[in-house]
From Swiss-Prot:
The lineage of its organism: Bacteria, Pseudomonadati, Pseudomonadota, Gammaproteobacteria, Vibrionales. Belongs to the isocitrate and isopropylmalate dehydrogenases family. LeuB type 1 subfamily. Disulfide bonds: none annotated. This is 3-isopropylmalate dehydrogenase. InterPro entries: IsoCit/isopropylmalate_DH_CS, IsoPropMal-DH-like_dom, Isopropylmalate_DH. Catalyzes the oxidation of 3-carboxy-2-hydroxy-4-methylpentanoate (3-isopropylmalate) to 3-carboxy-4-methyl-2-oxopentanoate. The product decarboxylates to 4-methyl-2 oxopentanoate. Homodimer. The keyword Manganese applies. It comes from Aliivibrio fischeri (strain ATCC 700601 / ES114). It is found in: Cytoplasm.
Length: 363
């Protein structure tokens, strides 16, 4: 059987990006050996390193490399070295936001779960964290109050005011809702749509459209929940949730809360998709310049981002599951990097990558 070859644009970026990306490469190498898949990988500069080498955070050559690929595996960008630059020229705002805009990445997927054996890291009460949870936040990325017009400031003195506008179109709600329901079909078949329909006109439309989309998914249960209640329920009993469907601003809040209650930010992957299932896959955490180059960073988020890439952009579900199973096996065996090991011996970044790749090869 001939191997199917996928073209991947690899953008390691700054800080810990290159060293955790190296571990993702090891895991993809193992996947090539175990499954009938090959990866053609091309590396490109992005963020601070691109500023140093090309004079801007997102060179034209990097954009072209991404355009010619099936998916983008992204590391992390930013660091103190570039903080003096104007905001739009800094690595974060000058690279990630233009990439999202260029590829019309309207959907952000943020999985959050407590892995077996890591319940103690959650800030939640033990009886809650021990029940575990496995949530995917599906966040609309390009609409809502962050981008709505008009926005601005005017006036002075006591009459000075500032304003933003929350706008959602029917088509924007429909397409994000469909992704949430499709995701739920692969999971526990429950969608929780988060809104503020008791106050906001945009949320009333959101709820109406989500209910219409739900009719096409009779096998999936739809639940509506107000944003204020949802933030409380995540603390009280996160195990009740499966897929959480959110607008841009509500998804921003909910996905960060989900990340915090896992207790291990270095474990959380993220995906941003467009309507063609082309995606950018990255760890949810930052570039951690304080630990860069020390071989102690946790590579799991980068490795799990590669699993999401296999699932959502490449349609290789079996390969995605084999990565996730290998990660779970390593963690439940107590093989942990310094951020999680506590007073036990810790694995280095590279040793963790080796271990997960080994579990894939031996599965």
């Amino acid at each position: 059987m001939t191997n199917k070859t996928y073209k991947i644009a690899v953008l390691p970026g700054d800080g810990i990006g290159p060293e955790v990306m190296e571990q993702a490469h090891k895991v993809l190498d193992a996947i090539e050996k175990k499954h009938a898949i090959s990866f053609s990988r091309e590396q490109h500069d992005v963020g601070g390193i691109a500023i140093d080498n090309h004079g801007c955070p997102l060179p034209e050559s990097t954009v072209k490399g991404c355009e010619e690929s099936d998916a983008v595996l992204f590391g992390s960008v930013g660091g103190p070295k570039w903080e003096h630059l104007p905001p739009n020229d800094q690595p974060e705002r000058g690279a990630l936001l233009p990439l999202r805009k260029h590829f019309q990445l309207f959907c952000n997927l943020r999985p959050a779960q407590i892995h077996k054996g890591l319940e103690n890291f959650s800030p939640l009460r033990a009886d809650i964290s021990e029940r575990g949870f496995d949530i995917v936040v599906v966040r609309e990325l390009t609409g809502g109050i962050y981008f709505g017009q008009p926005k601005g400031r005017e006036g002075e003195g006591p009459q000075e005011k500032a304003y933003d506008t929350e706008i959602y179109h029917r088509y924007e709600i429909e397409r994000i809702a469909k992704i949430a329901f499709e995701s739920a079909r692969l999971r526990n078949k429950n969608v929780y749509s988060i809104d503020k329909a008791n106050v906001l006109q945009s949320s009333i439309l959101w709820r109406e459209v989500v209910e219409e989309v739900a009719k096409g998914y009779p096998d999936v249960t739809l639940n509506h929940m107000y944003i204020d209640n949802a933030t409380m329920q995540l603390i009280k009993d996160p195990s009740q949730f499966d897929v959480m469907l959110c607008s841009n601003i509500f998804g921003d809040i909910i996905s960060d809360e989900c990340a915090m209650i896992t207790g291990s930010m270095g474990m959380l992957p993220s995906a941003s998709l467009n309507e063609s299932n082309f995606g950018l896959y990255e760890p949810a955490g930052g570039s951690a310049p304080d630990i860069a180059g020390k071989n102690i960073a946790n590579p799991v988020a980068q490795i799990l981002s590669a699993a999401l890439m296999l699932r959502y952009s490449l349609g290789e579900e079996e390969a995605a599951q084999s990565i996730e199973a290998a990660v779970s096996k390593a963690l439940s065996a107590g093989e942990l990097t310094a951020d999680l090991a506590g007073d036990k011996p810790a694995l280095t970044t590279s040793a963790m990558g080796d271990k997960i790749a080994e579990y894939i090869l031996n599965s």
